[in-house]
Amino acid sequence: MATPTQSPTNVPEETDPFFYDYATVQTVGMTLATIMFVLGIIIILSKKVKCRKADSRSESPTCKSCKSELPSSAPGGGGV
């Protein structure tokens, strides 16, 4: 049986900078995941994502992006 050559010294333990309260991390993570999931479902099911007034001449920011995707709604009615 081997004996230690030095006696153990009492070194004050420093606080670990990577110590996490895993219960809190898990709770916050699940809460954020739930919120993002519900917001994603709301965005998918929302009618506001689609451009309902693509035929009108209003220049709302939503319809501006829709008009760039639809070649038939371009001025002059020409295709790309």
Curated annotation (Swiss-Prot):
Membrane topology: Single-pass type I membrane protein
Cellular-component GO terms for this entry: plasma membrane
Pfam families: ATP1G1_PLM_MAT8 (PF02038)
Chief location category: membrane
Glycoprotein is among the record's keywords: yes
GO molecular function: ATPase binding; ion channel regulator activity
Positions of region (Disordered): 55-80
Keywords: Cell membrane, Glycoprotein, Ion transport, Membrane, Phosphoprotein, Potassium, Potassium transport, Sodium, Sodium transport, Sodium/potassium transport, Transmembrane, Transmembrane helix, Transport
Positions of post-translational Phosphoserine modification: 73
InterPro entries given in the database record: FXYD7, FXYD_motif, Ion-transport_regulator_FXYD
Residue ranges, Cytoplasmic side: 46-80
Taxonomy, superkingdom: Eukaryota
Single GO biological process annotation from the record: regulation of monoatomic ion transport
Spans within the Extracellular topological domain: 1-22
PTM field: O-glycosylated; required for stabilization and translocation to the plasma membrane.
Intracellular or extracellular location(s): Cell membrane
Membrane-spanning residues: 23-45
Glycan-linked positions: 3, 5, 9
Record note on domains: The transmembrane domain is important for the interaction with NKA and with the functional effect of FXYD7.
Quaternary structure (record): Regulatory subunit of the sodium/potassium-transporting ATPase which is composed of a catalytic alpha subunit, a non-catalytic beta subunit and an additional regulatory subunit. The regulatory subunit, a member of the FXYD protein family, modulates the enzymatic activity in a tissue- and isoform-specific way by changing affinities of the Na+/K+-ATPase toward Na(+), K(+) or ATP.
Protein family: Belongs to the FXYD family.
Job description of the protein: Associates with and regulates the activity of the sodium/potassium-transporting ATPase (NKA) which catalyzes the hydrolysis of ATP coupled with the exchange of Na(+) and K(+) ions across the plasma membrane. Reduces the apparent affinity for external K(+), an effect that depends on the presence of external Na(+) and voltage. Increases the apparent affinity for intracellular Na(+).
Protein name, UniProt field: FXYD domain-containing ion transport regulator 7
Gene name tied to this protein: Fxyd7
